[in-house]
Amino acid sequence: MSWVQVNLLVRSLSRGWGGLCRPALSGTPFAQVSLQALRGLHCSAATHKDEPWLVPRPPEPQRKPIKVPAMHEDLFKPSGNRERDKASFLNAVRSFGAHNVRKRGHVDFIYLALRKMPEFGVERDLSVYNLLLDVFPKEVFRPRNVIQRIFVHYPRQQECGVAVLEQMERHGVMPSAETEFLLIQIFGRKSYPMLKFLRMKLWFTRFKNINPYPVPRDLPQDPLDLAKLGLRHMEPDLSAKVTVYQMSLPSDSTGMEDPTQPHIVGIQSPDQQAALARHNPSRPVFVEGPFPLWLRNKCVYYHILRADLPPPEEEKVEEIPEEWELYYPQKLDLEYSRSGWDDYEFDVDEVTEGPVFAMCMAGAHDQATLIKWIQGLQETNPTLAQIPVVFRLARSTGELLTTSRLEGQSPPHSPPKGPEEDDETIQAEQQQGQS
């Protein structure tokens, strides 16, 4: 830079700073100082506008046209009359590797494949997850030195690998040795996906059989079999008997008296039958429900037949024979060396409820269907004929019905509703009842 250019630059800067310092020293208000400063700086900028060679601008880089990536959605669209099954999903994953040799956009493709897995029914297949991990390029994302190990090396790719393992964990898929080999080959041993794999390998083996009442992985598709499974899952007594009171008619049945006949399945144990036989006929029993029960990803609804807690004067204390006390003592008075500060009782909030006499699952939750269930229970429980029944359903107010009305009255069925509309109505009415 020549002396002439330096001189011009210093003069322009002195003009700007002079406009700032001179009014401040003379006691000018702050608003006027800022205004004068802006004017001085504006004038200096105007003088340099005619001299572009003083402050040269860097050349703007040429913007390349953005390449729109190929839409991966087309790979998962079934061609022709093919169904959405495992074969079509594997074909889509393999076609991505065949058409895209350099595997550009593989992270977006893997995220899309994870979202599409439930549609193809392969969210519980280990081989499909291993095939998705095989989409990653090998030996590229492994850290090579200490600095790369300290900082997250290729974070977006590691997050995608962790997302694959998290979906496996969500669906209860145990990773195998092939999964470990792929993770080491892709990300190395010192990586977040490998750390996630080690944690899954540790805790999956410990929590695999933690549920004392396991539910089968593949649930039956028939509503009747699903109802039997749900009732067996709720009833702790193994001697309880499952009874089918009414079978559902097929959808193409015509010319029948009741074309909308739903299924009715009930369960009752011998102890419940004995408790119902000892029930006071002057006190009513209640049919309550429907209550939800989740069996993995399916929700079924059940009803119960219960009674209120009897008053203390009507409770009968069962005497335990002395022979039972010898083999199965009910009370143990063992004196250990304890001080007066020891608490012999635990703080447990126990709420005593009335007895439950039976449970059922039906294809419809209206009063007409549950009346047929009560009529079926009267065949094995004769004392139920002298006990009034009160229906406390979520969609109706309680109505007192005696046995004579149950036998002589057969209300017409309500128009059939779809399962989604039926579930939404039940949930809405349950919320209204709670409020």
From Swiss-Prot:
Tissue: Detected in heart, brain, lung, liver, skeletal muscle, kidney and testis. Detected in embryonic mesoderm and epiblast, and in extraembryonic ectoderm.
Deleted gene: phenotype: Macrophages lacking ECSIT exhibit profound disruption of mitochondrial complex I/CI. Deletion lead to increased dependence on glycolysis and mitochondrial respiratory chain dysfunction.
Organelle transit peptide: 1-48
Modifications made to the protein after synthesis: Ubiquitinated on Lys-372; leading to translocation in the nucleus together with RELA and NFKB1 and expression of NF-kappa-B-dependent genes.
Keywords: Cytoplasm, Immunity, Innate immunity, Isopeptide bond, Mitochondrion, Nucleus, Transit peptide, Ubl conjugation
Principal location listed in the UniProt entry: cytoplasm
Gene Ontology biological process terms in this record: BMP signaling pathway; cell surface receptor protein serine/threonine kinase signaling pathway; innate immune response; mesoderm formation; regulation of oxidoreductase activity; regulation of protein complex stability; regulation of transcription by RNA polymerase II
Role description: Adapter protein that plays a role in different signaling pathways including TLRs and IL-1 pathways or innate antiviral induction signaling. Plays a role in the activation of NF-kappa-B by forming a signal complex with TRAF6 and TAK1/MAP3K7 to activate TAK1/MAP3K7 leading to activation of IKKs. Once ubiquitinated, interacts with the dissociated RELA and NFKB1 proteins and translocates to the nucleus where it induces NF-kappa-B-dependent gene expression.
Assembly description: Interacts with MAP3K1, SMAD4 and TRAF6. Interacts with SMAD1 only after BMP4-treatment. Part of the mitochondrial complex I assembly/MCIA complex that comprises at least the core subunits TMEM126B, NDUFAF1, ECSIT and ACAD9 and complement subunits such as COA1 and TMEM186. Interacts with NDUFAF1. Interacts with ACAD9. Interacts with TRIM59. Interacts with TMEM70 and TMEM242. Interacts (when ubiquitinated) with NF-kappa-B subunits RELA and NFKB1. Interacts with RIGI, IFIT1 and MAVS; these interactions promote RLR-mediated type I IFN induction.
Protein name according to UniProt: Evolutionarily conserved signaling intermediate in Toll pathway, mitochondrial
Organism (species): Mus musculus
